[in-house]
């Protein structure tokens, strides 16, 4: 059985980028179709899955979806085929709302220098647009997501408007750690975050569950299902469980159709005057490269041979310890404050900028209260002594984490592996990734700062974790640029090769930065929406 669907705009993917584009275009009374590979998520059922799960990791609320698989914690190669010197751990959720279901909610803008790495520091590459051009869309994105913050906190990105809602207050943990930072040449500031400090946009105020990763149980933290629903209310049509596997072009180099599979074995196709790919930085290049035919021998949108290259994941490293005095983690959102310094400066010509933040979730899922209890039980503690010992340890648990930016490297790439397929016969992604010396040098300096912080807190049981690619960021692979010989999309996110194809999401980033990328993804999507409306208005 096969179905054929038509719309003004066909959007593949319903994460934050696809959802915002769908919302903006549906509000403009355009006929919008959203094709999402995964299912809808019911928040209550997800919460029940999390409670019932033995391991409380970020996969716990979201059972595997055989027809739309992803890499999962501690089982990265069940889907990815990693072939490089470093394990690529960037993951995502294939479901309505995408990975924003389990993001931390941190919503910083990129800094002006993040858009001009080559011009400012002689490394990487410049973006085809600058901060000033994106600033109005940052304002719009903050209103759309409901970003809580304070204009008085300087995060290095000039702004004219205030945040739409007041900042999330710092935790007691933030205040204790912040008190020791001054003599170390550091200062703490409250993060802007897409989490309600007050009721906003029909969503409740944060109640401090400390479970933002993997799930906000009440919907106070923004996730993209918010704008999928708004798009549907404005007339958009959502087709969940529709796995797009091929893009078809016509003789005029326009996208004529996309083809999809369903888990029941049925097939479908969809045609739109404009097609928008918003399926993240792994699935999007995989789809483009799988769509080779006699007209596009290297794949769709790939005349530059750049599709799949320049894969980036921010690089993480953390330190844990037990502070001398109680700091009472496990209260409030998972992250509320971060260190201002070391994110930008002339040093970026030699090593990465560093984003350092404090975690409010103790030692996390693997080493938190449950693991502490098991360890103490093995030491023959029972009853009140066991209870007191668990409390003593958990109220002192601290993790400080730092993030480094890699430089874009053509050798870091993703391709479809034609020899290994998923449950419905689609090639799995084969990934080559290497952590570069630029990021390593930045994190080496960051670990010295971690040591100083834990020393000032008179901490014990201090341990530094290995350097790893972030599980929360997947960037590059269809990067934007003015030169069509070295990029896939232009400054408006329109494919150089196909006038009616737009690509939105982190895959268009030329460089990674150290700030969380979600707000920049949102701003770029809103900017592209305006261009799509203009293009449609000019079409016959």
Regions found by a protein language model. Name each.
Residues 76, 189-215, 219, 245-248, ...:
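A glycine-rich dinucleotide-binding beta-alpha-beta segment and adjacent secondary-structure elements
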Residues 27, 31-53, 233, 242, ...:
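Glycine-rich loop(s) and the adjacent beta-strand/alpha-helix scaffold that form part
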Residues 9-34:
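N-terminal Rossmann-like FAD-binding beta1-loop-alpha1 element of flavoenzymes
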Residues 39-65, 93-102:
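Conserved N-terminal glycine-rich FAD pyrophosphate-binding loop of Rossmann-like flavoproteins
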Residues 1-6:
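A short, basic/flexible loop-to-alpha-helix module at the beginning of a structural domain
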Residues 76-92, 96-99, 103, 127-131, ...:
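FAD cofactor-binding and catalytic pocket of flavoenzymes
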Residues 58-73, 79-85, 94, 109, ...:
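Conserved redox-cofactor binding core of oxidoreductases
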Residues 511-530:
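A conserved FAD-binding loop/helix module that cradles the flavin
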């Amino acid at each position: 059985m096969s179905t054929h669907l038509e719309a003004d705009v066909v959007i593949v993917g319903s994460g934050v980028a696809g959802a915002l584009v769908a919302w903006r275009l549906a509000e403009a009374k355009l006929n919008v179709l959203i094709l999402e590979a995964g299912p809808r998520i019911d928040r209550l059922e997800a919460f029940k899955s999390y409670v019932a799960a033995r391991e409380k990791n970020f996969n716990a609320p979201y059972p595997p979806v055989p027809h739309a698989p992803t890499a999962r914690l501690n089982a990265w190669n069940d889907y990815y085929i990693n072939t490089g010197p470093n394990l690529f751990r960037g993951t995502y959720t294939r479901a309505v709302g995408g990975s924003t279901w389990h993001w931390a909610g941190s919503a910083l803008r990129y800094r002006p220098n993040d858009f001009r790495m080559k011009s400012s520091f002689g490394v990487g590459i410049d973006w085809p647009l600058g901060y000033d051009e994106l600033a109005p869309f940052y304002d719009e994105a903050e209103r759309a997501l409901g970003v809580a913050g304070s204009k008085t906190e300087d995060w290095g990105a000039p702004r004219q408007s205030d945040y739409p809602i007041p900042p999330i207050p710092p935790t007691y943990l933030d205040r204790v750690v912040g008190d020791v930072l001054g003599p170390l040449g550091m200062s703490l500031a409250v993060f802007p975050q897409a989490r309600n400090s007050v009721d906003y946009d029909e969503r409740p105020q944060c109640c401090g569950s400390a479970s933002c990763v993997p799930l906000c149980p009440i919907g106070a933290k923004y996730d993209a299902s918010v704008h999928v629903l708004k798009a549907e209310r404005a007339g958009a049509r959502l087709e969940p469980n529709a796995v797009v596997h091929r893009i078809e072009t016509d003789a005029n180099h326009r996208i004529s159709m996309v083809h999809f599979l369903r888990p029941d074995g049925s097939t479908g196709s969809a045609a739109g005057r404009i097609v928008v790919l918003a399926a993240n930085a792994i699935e999007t290049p995989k789809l483009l490269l799988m769509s080779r035919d006699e007209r596009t021998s290297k794949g769709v949108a790939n005349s530059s041979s750049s599709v799949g290259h320049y894969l980036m994941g921010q690089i993480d490293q953390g330190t844990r310890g037990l502070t001398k005095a109680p700091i009472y983690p496990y209260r409030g959102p998972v992250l509320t404050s971060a260190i201002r310094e070391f994110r930008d400066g002339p040093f970026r010509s030699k090593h990465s900028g560093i984003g350092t933040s404090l975690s409010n979730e103790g030692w996390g899922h693997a080493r938190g209260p449950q693991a502490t209890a098991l360890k103490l039980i093995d030491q023959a503690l029972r009853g009140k002594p066991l209870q007191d010992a668990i409390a003593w340890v958990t109220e002192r648990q601290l993790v400080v984490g730092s993030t480094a930016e890699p430089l874009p490297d053509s050798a870091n790439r993703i391709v479809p592996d034609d020899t290994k397929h998923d449950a419905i016969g689609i090639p799995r992604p084969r990934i080559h990734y290497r952590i570069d010396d630029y990021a390593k040098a930045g994190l080496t300096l960051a670990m010295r700062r971690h040591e100083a912080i834990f020393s000032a807190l008179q901490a014990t049981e201090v341990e530094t974790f290995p350097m790893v690619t972030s599980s929360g960021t997947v960037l590059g692979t269809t990067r934007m640029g003015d030169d069509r010989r070295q990029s896939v999309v232009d400054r408006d996110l329109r494919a150089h090769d196909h006038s009616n194809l737009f690509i939105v999401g982190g895959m268009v980033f030329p460089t990674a930065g150290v700030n969380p990328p979600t707000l920049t993804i949102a701003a770029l999507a809103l900017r592209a929406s305006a261009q799509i409306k203009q293009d449609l208005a000019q079409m016959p």
